């Protein structure tokens, strides 16, 4: 009996792109000396407005990366994009000593962002954005600050609801 199996390409986890943000060797001091392991930070996105970040720790880098990718897939959030290329409005957020300022940009601007913030926008699918890191540039703090900023963002529907207007009125006033 032959079973006609379809490929699992329809599953959304195969459509995700992942970028390694940082790899650190960390140690735990035990009675016999130090135990070394690797801590990996990864961002995962579908390049259509969904993004997640995750951290994994293991004695091997490859295993730590697998753990980080699984954690990132579980923590994915939706970010509303304007014209599928930039943010709807400017936003800033703080996490620990890192503060990030994210600004929407005109067509053709590109991703003007440093370090780990650039990785987030690449997997998110943003083409035009300006970002500034103020304070600590520790990749972990910066990534979590960016995600805090994403959670502070409002969709056009939410903005229209707050202003008691229609969505079309909010969008055309840009």
Curated annotation (Swiss-Prot):
* Gene Ontology molecular function, alphabetical: rRNA binding; structural constituent of ribosome
Keyword field contains Manganese: no
Residue stretches making up the S5 DRBM domain: 16-79
One Pfam entry for this protein is: Ribosomal_S5_C
Q: Which residues form the signal peptide?
A: none
Q: Which UniProt keywords apply?
A: Ribonucleoprotein, Ribosomal protein, RNA-binding, rRNA-binding
User: What are the GO cellular component annotations?
Assistant: small ribosomal subunit
Record's keyword annotation contains Secreted: no
Tell me, what is an example of a GO biological process annotation in this record? translation
PANTHER family xref list = MITOCHONDRIAL RIBOSOMAL PROTEIN S5 (PTHR48277:SF1)
Q: How does it assemble?
A: Part of the 30S ribosomal subunit. Contacts proteins S4 and S8.
- What protein family does this chain belong to? Belongs to the universal ribosomal protein uS5 family.
Write out the function statement from the record. Answer: With S4 and S12 plays an important role in translational accuracy.
Free-text note regarding domains: The N-terminal domain interacts with the head of the 30S subunit; the C-terminal domain interacts with the body and contacts protein S4. The interaction surface between S4 and S5 is involved in control of translational fidelity.
Protein name in UniProt? Small ribosomal subunit protein uS5
Which organism does this record belong to?
A: Anaplasma marginale (strain Florida)
Q: Give the organism's phylogenetic lineage.
A: Bacteria, Pseudomonadati, Pseudomonadota, Alphaproteobacteria, Rickettsiales
């Amino acid at each position: 009996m032959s079973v006609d199996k379809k490929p699992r390409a329809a599953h959304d986890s195969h459509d995700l792109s992942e970028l390694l943000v940082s790899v650190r060797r960390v140690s735990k001091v035990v009675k016999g000396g130090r135990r070394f392991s690797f801590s990996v930070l990864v961002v995962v996105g579908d390049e259509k407005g969904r993004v997640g970040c995750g951290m994994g720790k293991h004695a091997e880098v490859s295993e730590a990366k697998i753990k980080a990718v699984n954690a990132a897939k579980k923590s994915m959030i939706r970010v509303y994009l304007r014209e599928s290329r930039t943010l709807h409005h400017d936003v800033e957020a703080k996490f620990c000593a890192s503060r990030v300022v994210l600004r929407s940009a005109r067509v053709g601007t590109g991703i003007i962002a440093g370090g780990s913030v650039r990785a987030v926008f690449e997997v998110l699918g943003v083409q035009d954005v300006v970002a500034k890191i103020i304070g600590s540039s520790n990749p972990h703090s910066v990534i979590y600050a960016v995600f805090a900023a994403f959670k502070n963002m409002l969709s056009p529907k939410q903005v229209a609801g707050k202003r008691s207007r229609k969505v079309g009125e909010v969008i055309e006033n840009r």
